[in-house]
């Protein structure tokens, strides 16, 4: 595959997974709310979040190694093998420590206020939630501690699209298993057990595929270098600390938000944010497949292709996805009522804050990719700490006055600060390696961001004028997109024109 083909295949797989996720949310949320109580569904959401937080060091380890693999490149299989096999023992140790930490927190009663802030939950449901969390944590050790690292190794050889398509298949089976289980009367605890079993069975051919790819590319087992493995683990743990704030900003808000506003309001907040999270994954479909190619351009100091890849991200995430978010804002009141069976209150202002926050987040993705791809630890820690403090402090202060809308406002403010810091640090690093941040394209992207944000808030305030606002913002963004397209390098423009010709015109 060429770089363009790998990017398109990886993006297609990621979009397919988003479609599966979207269908899953549309289908499973009504099923869950029809068969489970709101507190039981709220516990389901809390379990997902606590699981993400409890595995933060493992994820930091995997992500750090993933970028190290990309920096080494496909031409040094022995060096890749040494790094991979030296990291396996420490990956297992990290996962086991996280599992023990979850068990200790549960038996110490530290998670009681997270699941049951009002002290009125059914005791059986609380115990079932804790058991489900323990099972999930243990399964992480068995299924992902090593295979996730292997998946990052093969991405170096251009196998990211294939792994992404496997992820689509797994998502389909997981979604189907959850929906069918609940429809047949399974409780929260039983549903989790079924999901773990199904996920493990579906992952077996993935393990076989990874083994075949390793053998094909001469990634033979070697004796671990314990000092190298320890060094990588310590560096990744430092990175994981910054990831805690990032995860809290994106998903973990619900953990402490339930203590501030109650489980019901937290459930409303999380459910409204669900479709926003789907769009967040959409941004990942652009940046994740781009990462191996971006790292190659940085290694080769290819300014033209670097600018082209950044421009392509902004064109898709801001102009095209931004238009979709404007359209979604106009239909969400109807969709949300049908989706939740009227059991959860919809707040258009909160959804607008989420959508604009997503657009700001997408603006910073190229800068974040440059910083993360080069494992600039100090920069990531400082940025994440500053933004995390703003996010958490803002939520605590604003929710007392504005409720869950205040939490949404705090998240938006955090994204603004994050974008400013990331762009500043990325352009500073590019200068150090004699590359240039594309300021002219960045300013055009900001114009598109501003217009789309105004359109989204306008629909929230003037819902009866939503069609007119959508048409005007779409026309403006198409004009901006056409102007934006002029700055593409010639070879990149030729490829993109073939993809987006109907939208951009001749």
Can you name each region flagged by the protein language model?
Residues 1-7, 119-124, 188-194, 206-250, ...:
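Interhelical loop/hinge segments that connect adjacent transmembrane helices in multipass membrane
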Residues 4, 8, 140-165, 184, ...:
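Membrane-interface junctions at transmembrane-helix termini in multi-pass inner-membrane proteins
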Residues 9-26, 170, 194-210, 226-296, ...:
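Transmembrane helical elements of multi-pass membrane transporters/channels
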Residues 29-53, 188-193, 228-239, 255-277, ...:
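Interfacial/gating helices of multi-pass transporter permease domains
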Residues 59-74, 155-156, 215-218, 272, ...:
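Helix-loop junctions and terminal segments of transmembrane helices
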Residues 86-117, 176-180, 307-361, 392-401, ...:
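Alpha-helical transmembrane segments of multi-pass membrane transport and lipid-handling proteins
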Residues 164-214, 385-392, 404-426, 472-477:
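Hydrophobic alpha-helical transmembrane segments
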Residues 453-506:
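Membrane-proximal transmembrane or re-entrant/amphipathic helices at the cytosolic face
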């Amino acid at each position: 595959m060429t770089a363009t083909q790998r990017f398109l295949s990886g993006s297609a797989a990621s979009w397919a997974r988003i479609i599966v996720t979207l269908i899953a949310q549309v289908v499973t949320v009504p099923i869950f709310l029809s068969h489970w109580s709101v507190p039981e569904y709220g516990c389901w959401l809390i379990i997902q979040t606590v699981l993400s937080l409890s595995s933060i060091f493992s994820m930091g380890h995997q992500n750090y190694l993933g970028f190290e693999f990309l920096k080494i490149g496909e031409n040094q299989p022995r060096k890749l093998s040494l790094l991979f096999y030296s990291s396996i023992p420490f990956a297992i140790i990290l996962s086991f420590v996280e599992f023990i930490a979850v068990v200790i927190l549960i038996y110490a009663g530290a998670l009681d206020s997270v699941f049951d802030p009002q002290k009125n939950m059914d005791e059986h449901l609380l115990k079932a939630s804790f058991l489900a969390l323990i099972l999930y944590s243990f399964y992480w050790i068995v299924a992902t501690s090593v295979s996730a690292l292997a998946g990052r190794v093969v991405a170096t050889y251009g196998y990211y699209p294939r792994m992404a398509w496997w992820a689509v298949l797994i998502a389909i089976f997981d979604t189907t298993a959850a929906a069918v289980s609940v429809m047949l009367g399974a409780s929260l605890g039983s549903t989790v057990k079924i999901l773990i079993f199904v996920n493990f069975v579906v992952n077996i051919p993935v393990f076989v595929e990874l083994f075949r790819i390793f053998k094909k590319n001469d990634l033979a087992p070697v004796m671990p270098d314990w000092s190298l493995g320890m060094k990588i683990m310590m560096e990744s743990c430092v990175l994981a600390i910054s990831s805690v704030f990032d995860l809290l900003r994106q998903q973990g808000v619900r953990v402490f938000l339930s203590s501030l506003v109650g489980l019901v309001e937290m459930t409303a907040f999380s459910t409204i944010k669900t479709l926003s999270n789907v769009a967040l994954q959409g941004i990942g479909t652009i940046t994740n497949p781009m990462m191996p190619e971006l790292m190659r351009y940085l290694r080769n100091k290819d300014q033209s292709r670097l600018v082209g890849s950044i421009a392509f991200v902004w064109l898709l995430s801001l102009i095209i996805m931004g238009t979709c978010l404007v359209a979604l804002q106009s239909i969400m009141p109807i969709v949300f009522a049908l989706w939740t069976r009227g059991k959860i209150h919809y707040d258009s202002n909160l959804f607008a804050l989420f959508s604009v926050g997503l657009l700001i987040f997408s603006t910073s993705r190229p800068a974040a990719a440059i910083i993360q791809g080069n494992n600039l630890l100090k920069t990531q820690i400082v940025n994440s700490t500053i933004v995390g403090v703003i996010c958490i402090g803002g939520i605590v202060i604003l929710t007392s006055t504005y409720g869950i809308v205040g939490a949404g406002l705090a998240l938006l403010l955090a994204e603004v600060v994050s974008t400013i810091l990331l762009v500043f640090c990325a352009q500073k690093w590019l200068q150090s390696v004699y590359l240039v941040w594309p300021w002219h394209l960045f300013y055009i992207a900001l114009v598109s961001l501003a217009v789309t944000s105004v359109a989204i808030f306008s629909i929230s305030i003037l819902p009866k004028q939503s069609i007119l606002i959508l048409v005007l913002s779409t026309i403006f963004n198409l004009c901006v997109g056409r102007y934006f397209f002029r700055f593409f390098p010639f070879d990149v423009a030729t490829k993109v024109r073939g993809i987006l010709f109907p939208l951009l015109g001749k």
